[in-house]
UniProtKB/Swiss-Prot annotation:
Species assigned in the record: Mannheimia succiniciproducens (strain KCTC 0769BP / MBEL55E)
One of the record's GO cellular component terms: cytosolic small ribosomal subunit
HAMAP family xref list: Ribosomal_bS6 (MF_00360)
Keywords linked to the UniProt accession: Ribonucleoprotein, Ribosomal protein, RNA-binding, rRNA-binding
Chain's gene name: rpsF
Name of the protein in its database record: Small ribosomal subunit protein bS6
Listed Acidic residues bias regions: 116-125
Highest classification ranks of the organism: Bacteria, Pseudomonadati, Pseudomonadota, Gammaproteobacteria, Pasteurellales
Domain of life: Bacteria
Function of the protein: Binds together with bS18 to 16S ribosomal RNA.
Length: 125
């Protein structure tokens, strides 16, 4: 089995359906004997340029190890699902399990906000 990185963008009005979509896609990978190495839901993000007059989309990143049949099935599913605006499937040489730069930046912002809150609370006392 080969390793793949999959990113898909979902219509912002369909954001509530994303958890079900993720469950369905990861289920099909696992049923075929594949593995999910990394799964990140980046949430709604601003697009670099409008797609179908939309300026935001819900992003999901998956790193999987799966047979080619599953990848072909996912491609077909993405193609015929109107909620998926764009998708990309890239074959990688090895499994990627570390957090993506998007998640690292988000965690750093969260940590710095907590430090600022603690400093503010200390200043009040």
């Amino acid at each position: 089995m080969r390793h793949y990185e999959i990113v898909f963008m979902v219509h912002p009005d369909q954001s509530e359906q994303v958890p079900g979509m993720i469950e369905r896609y990861t289920g099909s990978v696992k049923e075929a004997g594949g593995q999910i190495h990394r799964l990140e839901d980046w949430g709604r993000r601003q697009l670099a340029y409008p797609i179908n007059k939309l300026h935001k989309a819900h992003y999901v990143l998956m790193n999987v190890e799966a047979p080619q049949e599953v990848i072909d099935e996912l491609e077909t599913t993405f193609r015929y699902n109107d909620a998926v605006l764009r998708n990309v499937i890239i074959r990688t040489k090895h499994a990627v399990t570390e957090a993506s730069p998007m998640v690292k930046a988000k965690d750093e912002r969260r940590a710095s906000a907590e430090v600022e809150n603690n400093d503010f609370e200390d200043a009040e006392e």
